[in-house]
Each structure stands twice: as structure tokens, then as C-alpha cells.
């Protein structure tokens, strides 16, 4: 069945809460905003917003594009100073070994001096909780082991913890401990908004499952909570500003279904989030490509021809690279079409521009007035023609897309585990073990023949691995049967090596979800 276009009348709502952009085009197409972000930060930003909405009692309540959805995030100022801005902790413990009073007195003096300039705090509450200074030292060491992406050379106020519980969730901070958007770029918040637009049944079921993982009080959560002070002031002011343009989109339910299927498995809590980060990056990538397609005149999902890692180049590898470039380059065509349609859909403006009795200055002024409002265009006035003005706006819009959206697409493909340069000097679609495992966990509720899994991956995500699906949709010159059959055989071997498949005596391969089924 043909998908309805997401750009149909009534499915988009404009953003009216302030536009943080020199030209609001990419944001109007993909949202505010799609920007390059590390995988651990994408997951953490999503969970921060989810937990903040849970505290409000609005977790996965339905949202609309025109709403400015705001939430309070944890500052965790004291926690971060203790963990990441505390250089003398080990020295004090060594120097005053055996004397808790001396150790606490020296450390409290040191930490007050370290925190005095921009983040003054009273850390004396820790002495009451940890009479033995060594217990405090061991607690700090234990929590430091849960740092996500350790050794990444980020500033100390940007270091993030694995989400052991809500007390381990907080937002990257600037020098004054306000929200810093260099690491949390809003892409994780876009993921939350996508889920909030899924069908009601999916939202309710997913909210029930994820709420349990975001509530406090667990043993793991208490480990981090022990370093936090009590009382008020633990949360920042409510912040919003993230915009997702579409009321409905095929990507919303697809993402919600994947996460719900994952949440329904009896995975250890750490594994749930480890798999989840790949699923949300992958689904956000699909959302972006599919959105580009709609603006380019087709409601079909993007095709992902995937090489299962090979030692040499073949037709599959060649087309997987071509396919990736074609998919991501459509973003620029989407920008072009958006700008053209914006002008064409304003009948009053088109009438002025077509009126031969109007001077060029009047036409340019009318065009400038309209686009300055719609696009938040910050452009110095110059005496030019209408066509020059249009070209200038198009150039600015495409430059912004090249700065933000194109790198974001490349980053999402890479961090999801969908793309790689391994064995070549160009990126191509070649899924990693982590992504393959995530897709199996989200799509195999019970033992299934491998061919049926391949059918599902094709129907659901447009992933092409075998000759069966390649021959349905690819140009004839890129369908070499033997190459795709070898690609499928490598996929089988990968599944078996990951413990996700077994080849039976009848030569039929069965794929299993290790948390739902045993062969």
C-alpha cells in the first residue's frame, strides 16, 4: 500500500517559539535539530528528556509540532565535581590513611577551593554518609567505571555516566552549569518526540515498559544517589525548543515498535540500553532519509543495499556505496524543493512577482519580507534582482544543510553501525555485529527461517542483502545473482557466529532470539 506523503496539508505545523538559525530551512524539513552527535550522547539525551517527562507525569503523552515541550534536567553539579573535577582524592586518601578526620578535613578544604570559582557547593554532607573516607573513595572509583565513552578528552562537565538509574542522568554543562548544546545537540530529543507521535497503543505500552527503567529507588540508582545532596536545586529551569515538523510519519511507529519489542525481552538492564542506542540511531537515520524522499516527490522508504563484510570488492560493495551517497545527497534536493514550494504556495507573493507593472525593487522587497519571516532570514539588504535573491537564499539554505544535516546523516549511519570504510576508502552500507544483533532482537520474537527474516528486514527497513530483493528494486546492471547469493551466505555465517542462528540437517537456517527462544 502506498504511503501518504508526510508533506500533505494538515500534517505539518510551523514553529512559532523562536528560531535559533540564520536560515530556517533544514529545521523546517527535518526538525530542530538534526546535528552530528556521539552515540552515547544521543542515548543519554533521549533518556534525560524521557526521565524529565516522567517526573512531570507526561511520559510519552501525545505531542504536536507547534508545542514547545519543556522539561527540567538534573544539574548533578556536586556529583560531577566529585567524579571528574577532584584531582586530589587519591592523594588525600594515601596521605591520611588510617585517619578519617584528617582525610575528610583535607579533602573538604581541597574540593571547596576547586569548586569555588564557578560552582560553589557545600560537600560536608558526604562526611555524614561516609564516616570512613576509604568507603567514599571506593564509591567514587565504582561510579567512575560507569563513564560512557571514557578517554574521549571531553571537558569534565561533559562526561556522562551509563544510565544506571535517574540519578546518573544529567545534561552536559557549560562553565556556569547551564545546559551546553555542543554535546546534546537535540537529536536525542527528536527521538523522544518521534515516540510521542506514535500510535496511542504503542505509546502506552512503551511508557509502561520504559517507566520501570527510569524510576529511582533501585540498588544501582542508590549507588549514584549516595553522592548527591538532598533538598532543592537539583534540577535546572525547564527548557524546550526542540521541533519535529510532522504530526505523523512512518518512522514514528517503526521506532516505537522496535523499542517496545526490545523492552519486552528479559534483557539485563545494561544490555537493554546498549542495544537501544543502536536502534534509535538507526531509526533516526531512516527518518531523515525517508523525509528527504518525501520532499523529493516519493513516499517510498530509502533503499539500503548492505554488504555483509567481504574480503574483496564486488557488485554488492559497489552499489552499497552508490546507494549510501544517493540517499544522503537527496537532502540537498529536499532543501531546493522546500524553498521552491514555499514561494509557489504563497499565491499573493506569486501574483506580485508575476506582475510586470511592479518594479524589481518592490518585488525583491515583497520576497524579502516573506522569506525573512518564514525562514528567519538574517540577510543584509542589497540591490539585486528577484532571481539573484532566490539564488542567494538557495545557496544559504544548501550551505546550512551541508554544515549540519549532511554530516549528521554520515554520523548517524556510522554510530548506528550501518556504515563503514573498512577495506575501502569510501563509506558504504555494511552493518556491524552490534546492529545485526539489535535488528534480530527487535524483529525475531520466535524461531524463524532466515529467508523470512530477510523478507522482514526488506519490508520494514528496505534492507537488501539477498538476490531475491535486489532483483525486485535495483537496476539490472547492479544485480549479479552470484554476488548477492554469496552476500546472503556471509550473512548466515555472521548470524551463526553471533549465536543468533543454527543451520539444521535439512540445510535450512533458523534465526533465533536468544532471549525468547532456544533451538
Annotate each language-model stretch with its function:
Residues 177, 196, 237, 242-245, ...:
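Short, charged/polar micro-motifs that form catalytic or ligand-binding hotspots
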Residues 93-266, 270:
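Long, mid-chain structured domain cores
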Residues 49-56, 89, 114-118, 143-146, ...:
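Surface-exposed polar/charged interaction patches
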Residues 34-37, 41, 98-102, 124, ...:
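Alpha-helix boundary/N-cap detector
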Residues 230-374:
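Long, internal scaffold/assembly segments composed of regular secondary structure
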Residues 42-49, 78, 82, 92, ...:
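Charge-rich, solvent-exposed alpha-helical interaction surfaces
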Residues 351-519:
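C-terminal structured domains
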Residues 1-118:
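Charged, amphipathic alpha-helical stretches
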Amino acid at each position: 500500500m502506498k504511503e501518504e506523503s508526510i508533506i500533505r496539508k494538515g500534517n505539518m505545523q510551523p514553529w512559532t517559539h523562536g528560531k535559533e538559525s540564520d536560515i530556517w530551512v533544514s529545521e523546517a524539513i527535518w526538525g530542530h535539530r538534526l546535528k552530528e552527535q556521539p552515540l552515547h550522547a544521543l542515548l543519554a539525551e533521549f533518556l534525560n528528556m524521557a526521565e524529565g517527562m516522567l517526573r512531570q507525569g507526561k511520559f510519552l503523552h501525545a505531542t504536536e509540532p507547534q508545542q514547545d515541550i519543556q522539561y527540567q534536567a538534573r544539574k548533578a553539579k556536586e556529583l560531577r565535581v566529585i567524579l571528574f573535577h577532584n584531582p586530589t582524592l587519591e592523594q588525600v586518601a594515601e596521605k591520611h590513611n588510617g585517619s578519617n578526620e584528617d582525610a575528610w578535613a583535607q579533602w573538604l578544604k581541597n574540593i571547596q577551593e576547586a569548586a569555588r570559582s564557578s560552582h560553589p557547593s557545600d560537600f560536608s554532607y558526604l562526611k555524614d554518609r561516609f564516616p570512613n573516607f576509604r568507603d567514599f573513595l571506593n564509591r567514587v572509583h565504582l561510579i567512575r567505571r560507569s563513564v560512557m565513552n571514557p578517554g574521549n578528552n571531553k571537558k569534565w562537565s561533559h562526561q556522562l555516566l551509563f544510565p544506571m538509574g535517574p540519578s546518573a542522568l544529567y545534561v552536559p554543562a557549560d562553565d556556569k552549569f547551564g545546559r551546553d548544546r555542543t554535546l546534546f545537540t537535540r537529536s536525542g530529543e527528536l527521538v523522544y518526540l518521534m515516540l510521542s507521535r506514535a500510535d496511542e497503543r504503542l505509546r502506552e505500552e512503551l511508557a509502561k515498559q520504559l517507566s520501570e527503567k527510569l524510576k529511582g529507588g533501585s540498588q544501582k540508582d542508590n549507588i549514584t544517589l549516595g553522592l548527591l545532596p538532598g533538598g532543592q536545586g537539583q534540577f535546572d529551569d525547564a527548557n524546550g525548543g526542540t521541533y519535529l515538523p510532522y504530526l505523523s510519519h512512518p518512522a514514528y511507529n517503526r521506532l516505537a515498535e522496535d523499542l517496545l519489542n526490545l523492552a519486552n525481552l528479559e534483557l539485563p538492564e545494561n544490555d537493554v540500553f546498549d542495544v537501544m542506542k543502536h536502534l534509535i540511531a538507526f531509526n533516526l537515520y531512516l527518518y531523515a532519509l525517508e523525509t528527504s524522499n518525501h520532499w523529493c516527490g516519493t513516499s517510498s522508504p530509502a533503499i539500503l543495499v548492505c554488504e555483509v563484510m567481504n574480503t574483496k570488492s564486488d557488485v554488492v560493495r559497489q552499489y552499497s556505496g552508490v546507494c549510501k551517497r544517493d540517499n544522503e545527497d537527496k537532502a540537498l534536493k529536499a532543501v531546493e524543493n522546500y524553498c521552491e514550494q514555499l514561494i509557489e504556495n504563497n499565491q499573493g507573493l506569486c501574483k506580485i512577482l508575476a506582475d510586470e507593472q511592479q518594479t524589481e525593487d518592490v518585488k525583491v522587497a515583497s520576497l524579502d519580507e516573506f522569506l525573512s519571516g518564514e525562514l528567519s532570514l538574517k540577510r543584509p539588504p542589497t540591490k539585486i534582482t528577484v532571481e539573484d535573491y532566490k539564488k542567494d537564499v538557495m545557496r544559504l539554505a544548501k550551505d546550512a544543510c551541508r554544515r549540519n544535516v549532511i554530516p549528521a546523516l554520515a554520523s548517524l549511519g556510522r554510530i548506528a553501525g550501518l556504515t563503514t570504510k573498512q577495506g575501502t576508502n569510501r563509506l558504504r552500507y555494511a552493518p556491524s555485529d552490534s546492529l545485526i544483533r539489535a535488528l534480530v532482537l527487535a524483529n525475531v520474537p520466535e524461531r524463524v527461517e532466515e529467508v523470512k527474516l530477510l523478507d522482514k528486514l526488506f519490508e520494514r527497513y528496505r534492507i537488501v542483502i539477498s538476490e531475491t530483493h535486489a532483483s525486485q528494486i535495483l537496476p539490472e546492471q547492479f544485480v549479479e545473482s552470484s554476488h548477492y547469493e554469496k552476500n546472503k551466505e556471509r550473512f548466515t555465517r555472521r548470524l551463526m557466529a553471533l549465536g543468533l542462528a543454527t543451520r539444521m540437517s535439512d540445510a535450512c537456517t533458523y534465526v533465533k532470539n536468544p532471549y525468547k527462544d532456544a533451538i
